[in-house]
Curated annotation (Swiss-Prot):
Homodimer. It catalyses: L-xylulose + ATP = L-xylulose 5-phosphate + ADP + H(+). The lineage of its organism: Bacteria, Pseudomonadati, Pseudomonadota, Gammaproteobacteria, Pasteurellales. Keywords: ATP-binding, Kinase, Nucleotide-binding, Transferase. Its EC number is 2.7.1.53. GO terms for molecular function: ATP binding; L-xylulokinase activity; phosphotransferase activity, alcohol group as acceptor. This is Probable L-xylulose kinase.
Length: 485
């Protein structure tokens, strides 16, 4: 039996999992990754600490399995997109990594919006503007930390950095870097005109070569092996953007299925074989790890992170108890609304979170119910836009932590009016990365591995009409917030 290691570096956790050649999970370990936020809007990560935590979870997952490190045939890494990790001329971390949820480039993005720069770069990159894009972060550093900017030797993203720590080889992986605004989507390569447009021309030479998801980037070094418990010489592949990894594990094959991810971010994805230039909505495209395919997705950090914050602030019991109590409430019966914008907004740049409609008879459970509803209402803006691009989509395959909550999934089915399928896969990031490792080591048919059971949720027509009324109240609430500042 052959075994494969999949590493998943997300917004709050890093995980390492071992799978056999059939995609069966053998062992998994995880650690929380601290986010450093010393100033309002900052979201940073200590790069040395990140690698140390990665090495620890690799060690732990090997140790708690019955598998020898020599039996691991290849390694893949999945990680969150955007953000920026910098190395100096000695290939040492140059300060902290800046994550995709960082908002320090707010004024720069706001200025670009006023200049209508989107009209110039969107036809090339098929990306929109975001504060956490590498180009936005780099422009901020150029203007505010010029000395650090001059010392940047290499620009990476999260899994590129971890891959470098394992192999000492420098690459940018295609599915992730294709959504950086440095990448010409139509030509499939970096474009210096983009760097010039964003005022960071110098950066184009600091981007390493691009590598595909299932191609071998390098081999585990003796130093990395000693730190992680691996053995020297194991192949490490390019890996995946975590949104792509999840879509891959959702086994999207046609325009009738969409993938919804609920985690730190709410993401709606679809897979297509062509760029549709007739659309008026600026859909975000990215490279997909299958020949001549693109992923299209809508996303914002308006998801379960809001619930996690509330639970931590008020030291609430476990999520099963919360689900049980919410299930006792009548759907859409409360007047309480929640804008899930603690970490960013999909309605207006800089819009913040908040409750509205609280009355004296409401309890903490009503607030939690409003958070559940608010996350789905916010998700609907992405889902409705994606249905414009994928009008035949009738089924949503849902992954992420909230997919374990039956009350939350039924709420999504009732609000959207769509059939839900919940794949019996808990670790899509790790599995997707491992699948790329399998492809590099042998010819593997991914669809056979992903031929798994799915739990079904069907919409309740009666609840749908009730939720529509509250959803329209939510939209009015968000519109009012837009005009507040």
């Amino acid at each position: 039996m052959h075994y494969y290691l999949g590493i998943d570096c997300g917004g709050t956790f890093i995980k390492a999992a071992i799978f056999d050649q059939n995609g069966t999970l053998q062992s998994i370990a995880r650690r929380n990754i601290p986010i450093i936020s010393e100033k309002p809007g900052y979201a940073e990560r200590d790069m040395d600490e990140l690698w140390n935590l990665c090495a620890q979870v690799i060690q732990k997952t090997i140790r708690q399995s019955s598998i020898l490190p020599q039996q691991i045939k290849a390694i893949g890494i999945s990680a969150q997109g955007k953000g920026a990790f910098f190395l100096d001329k000695d290939n040492k971390p140059l300060g902290r990594a800046i994550l995709s949820s960082d908002q320090r480039a707010y004024e720069i993005v706001q200025c670009w919006q006023k200049e209508n720069i989107l009209q110039k770069f969107y036809p090339i990159t098929l990306q929109t503007l975001w504060m956490g894009h590498p180009v936005s972060i780099l422009r901020w550093i150029k203007e505010n930390e010029p000395s650090r900017y001059e010392q940047i030797h290499t620009i990476l993203m999260s899994h590129d950095y971890l891959r470098f720590c394992l192999t000492e080889k420098l690459y940018c992986e295609e599915t992730n870097i294709s959504e950086s605004n440095f990448y010409n989507m139509r030509e499939g390569k970096y474009d210096i005109q983009l760097a010039k447009l964003f005022g960071i021309t110098e950066c184009i030479d600091k981007l390493p070569p691009i590598i595909k998801s299932n191609k071998i980037a390098g081999y585990v070094t003796s130093r990395a092996a000693e730190q992680s418990g691996l053995v020297e010489g194991i192949p490490v592949v390019g890996g995946l953007f975590d949104v792509v990894s999840t879509a891959l594990c959702a086994d999207l094959k046609d325009d009738q299925h969409l993938n919804v991810v609920l985690g730190t971010w709410s993401v709606v994805s679809g897979v297509t074989h062509y760029i549709d230039d007739n659309q008026t909505i600026p859909f975000v495209y990215g490279k997909y790890p299958e020949k001549n395919k693109f992923i299209i997705h809508e996303a914002s950090p308006t998801s379960a992170g809001n619930l996690e914050w509330f639970v931590n602030q008020f030291n609430l019991p476990n999520y099963d108890d919360i689900n049980h109590e919410i299930a006792k409430l009548k759907p859409a019966s409360s007047s309480v609304l929640f804008a899930p914008f603690l970490y960013g907004s999909n309605a207006k740049l800089g819009m913040q979170a908040g409750f509205y409609g609280i009355q004296s008879h409401h309890t903490q459970i009503h607030l939690l119910q409003a958070i559940y509803e608010g996350v789905i209402f916010s998700l609907m803006s992405h889902l409705e836009r994606m249905q414009v691009r994928f009008p035949n989509a009738s089924t949503v395959r849902v992954t992420g932590g909230p997919a374990k909550s039956e009350v939350w999934m039924q709420m999504l089915a009732d609000i959207s009016g769509m059939r839900l399928e919940i794949p019996n896969i808990e670790e899509t990031g790790c599995l997707g990365a491992a699948l790329m490792a399998m492809q590099a080591e042998s010819a593997v048919e991914i669809s056979q591995i992903l031929n798994i059971d799915r739990k079904i949720f069907l919409p309740d027509k009666n609840q749908y009409s009730k939720y529509q009324h509250k959803y329209h109240r939510y939209l009015k609430f968000i519109e009012a917030l837009k005009n507040l500042d």
